[in-house]
Amino acid sequence: MTVAVYPGSFDPITKGHMDIVERAAQIFHEVIVAVVINPNKKPLFTMDERVEMIRMAVSHISNVRVESFSGLLVDFTRKQGARAIVRGLRAVSDFEVEFQMALMNKRLYPEVETVFMATHTDYAFLSSSMVKEVASFGGDVSDYLPPAVLARMAEKYGDTVRGKAPVR
């Protein structure tokens, strides 16, 4: 049974992330969406909120589970019995950084393979940071987020993120 880990901060999880999760779930027996605690980032959503939103977003996929972790990805991957790390690539610039991380992960955990998945062209421009920025200015981000996540964004930024005009 091949287990894969798909790591990220997922603040919030987007439809681009979901595309990777759904496709990885078709390849691997089990996919663990690993929500990382990154002390260098100031998240919009707490760890518990992110885990909860992701669990709601992936609830229709039977072979996906969601966990949080801190520390080295390879340590988490090894503890989970996973042999693959899934990474989504939006552009060549993503590959530069991801390739270096894959090589380091291989050094630290020789049994692990990094699997790069090209993002669907509909989401090649998309990032959590971009979604948060658009939402912070009252923009409509409804095309980019799973429904449960969109509801949480509306709680933070108001209904304009759903494409609804503010009530006057």
Curated annotation (Swiss-Prot):
Q: What is the lineage of its organism?
A: Bacteria, Bacillati, Bacillota, Clostridia, Eubacteriales
Q: Which cofactor does it need?
A: Mg(2+)
Q: Where is this site: Transition state stabilizer?
A: H17
- Asked if the keyword ATP-binding belongs to this entry, the reply reads yes
Give the InterPro entries listed for this entry. Answer: Cyt_trans-like (IPR004821), PPAT (IPR001980), Rossmann-like_a/b/a_fold (IPR014729)
For this entry, the protein name equals: Phosphopantetheine adenylyltransferase
What is the uppermost EC class here?
transferase
Annotated transmembrane regions: none
Task: Name the positions where ATP binds.
Answer: S9, F10, H17, G88, L89, R90, E98, Y123, A124, F125, L126, S127, S128, S129
Q: Quote the pathway field.
A: Cofactor biosynthesis; coenzyme A biosynthesis; CoA from (R)-pantothenate: step 4/5
**Which reaction is catalysed here?**
(R)-4'-phosphopantetheine + ATP + H(+) = 3'-dephospho-CoA + diphosphate
EC number(s): the record gives: 2.7.7.3
Record function comment:
Reversibly transfers an adenylyl group from ATP to 4'-phosphopantetheine, yielding dephospho-CoA (dPCoA) and pyrophosphate.
What is stated as this protein's family in its record? Belongs to the bacterial CoaD family.
User: Can you tell me which residues bind substrate?
Assistant: S9, K41, L73, R87
Please cite one Gene Ontology biological process associated with this protein.
coenzyme A biosynthetic process
Q: Which GO terms describe its cellular component?
A: cytoplasm
